[in-house]
A protein has these predicted regions:
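Surface-exposed loop and turn segments in beta-propeller and other repeat-based domains
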Residues: 114-126, 170-184, 228-252, 297-327
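Bacterial N-terminal signal peptides that target proteins for export
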Residues: 1-12
């Protein structure tokens, strides 16, 4: 998840930083079968699959205007848990929340606070490890979980869902070795075509000592794209590096340091990726699924919009927005707000920073993108989510789940 000199003492106490010299080599990935490229299900801008899509599609493309008046906002506490880190919403509106230690609970619904999954005996919270992300499959009967196992390696598996409960044995989706206990990444999201995306950090250590960010032979520092429909685990045949002998076929995009977090905005058909920087810049990337394939987000040749280890790589996709260090130090990516309670925010990407906790929204200022402060601050935010109504949830490592509301 994190790193920063200015918060070393605090974050070490939370198990969120591990710095180590790198003396290891990357393992080659295990080959996966290839499946025909999945067809888009038609859910995108203007799709009937989102009850707000008609509204959104009628707006001009892009973010809301920066001169829009914003209301006074505040954060109300929903519940206190143990290091909540991610959420997902089931078909019936039940909200599940993942705790970093390995439990998935019902946040609200018929039986609030009920534990539906407990993998705490199979993971560890050393360094930046733990249960990192959850996502319900588009077909509704599987809960996908991204975590590090007891050895610290990345593990993605799918648990069969029966209503809001877990029934049966999980199926293994993907594993890869993690050389160190930081820069694990771990966010998972589904695209409209049913493919699963997994964001992975560069393997750890300052300055990308493994060279993973620009090394297509490893899934580290990359976004993995898999076809996991109908019980299969395969590489889609349109993955960009499938025919490249020295590349991992599952890699869809490269050049990431530590993606924290990813979100797919279904009405606009856009993937948002927040990538934690080294010591100068924090960045936010926005691409369509088509633009994702073969994208190079720059690390470690670039850090945000500035050079780091070399020249700008071929095919570089620069960030939509980046910012320097000051009050902030380590971005916590959010999502595009699609709720009804705060229409002034609708269509804006809300995010924060682990160090200063100020919630911000990306908005359009002419040809430029700017971040406006929302006037509300949380403490050490490590994730965002939504409730069943699409209202924004803020997750603090200290345990609080907060909802963004109008004053």
């Amino acid at each position: 998840m994190r790193r920063r000199t200015s918060m070393v003492v605090t974050l070490l106490a939370s198990g969120l930083i591990l710095a180590a010299a790198c003396t290891t080599e990357l393992d080659p990935p295990t080959p996966l079968p290839v499946a025909p490229a999945p067809a888009d299900d038609g859910a995108g801008p203007g799709s009937e699959d989102d009850d707000r899509a008609d509204d959104v599609a009628s707006e001009a493309p892009g973010l809301p205007p920066a001169d829009r008046d914003l209301p006074r906002l505040s954060l109300e506490e929903v519940v206190t848990l143990e290091a909540p880190i991610d959420t997902t919403v089931l078909e019936d509106g039940t909200v599940l929340v993942a705790e970093r230690a390995g439990r998935v609970r019902v946040l609200d619904g018929p039986t609030p606070d009920r534990i539906v999954l407990d993998v705490s005996g199979r993971t560890t919270t050393d360094g930046e490890r733990g249960l990192l992300s959850i996502a319900v499959a588009p077909w509704g009967d599987e809960l996908f979980v991204s975590m590090t196992d007891a050895d610290g390696d990345t593990l993605v598996e799918a648990h069969p869902l029966d209503g809001a409960g877990i029934e049966g044995t999980p199926r293994s989706i993907y594993t890869t070795r993690q050389p160190f206990a930081n820069h694990n990444g771990g966010p998972i999201v589904f695209l409209p075509d049913g493919t699963l995306l997994l964001g992975l950090g560069d393997g750890g250590g300052a300055g990308d000592p493994l060279g993973a960010g620009q090394d297509l032979s490893t899934p580290l520092g990359a976004i993995v794209r898999l076809d996991v429909r109908d019980g299969r685990v395969a590489v889609p045949s349109d993955n960009p590096f499938l025919e490249q002998a020295d590349a991992a076929a599952e890699v869809a995009a490269s050049g990431l340091r530590n993606p924290w977090r990813m979100a797919f905005d279904r009405p606009r058909g856009e993937l948002w990726i927040a990538d934690v920087g080294q010591s100068e810049r924090e960045e936010i990337n926005r691409v369509t699924p088509a633009q994702l394939l073969g994208a190079n987000f720059g690390w470690a040749l670039r850090e945000g919009t500035v050079p780091f280890l070399g020249e700008e790589p071929d095919g570089h996709v620069p960030p939509l927005h980046d910012y320097g260090h000051g009050p902030g130090c380590s971005i916590t990516g959010g999502l595009v707000y699609r709720g009804d309670a705060i229409p002034e925010l609708r269509g804006g990407y809300v995010f924060t920073d682990l160090c200063d906790g100020e919630l911000r929204v990306l908005m359009q200022d002419g040809a430029d993108v700017t971040a406006r402060e929302l006037g509300v601050t949380a403490t050490r935010v490590i994730g965002f989510g939504t409730d069943a109504d699409g209202e924004l949830l803020v997750l603090e490592i200290g345990g609080r789940v907060l909802r963004l509301v109008r004053d």
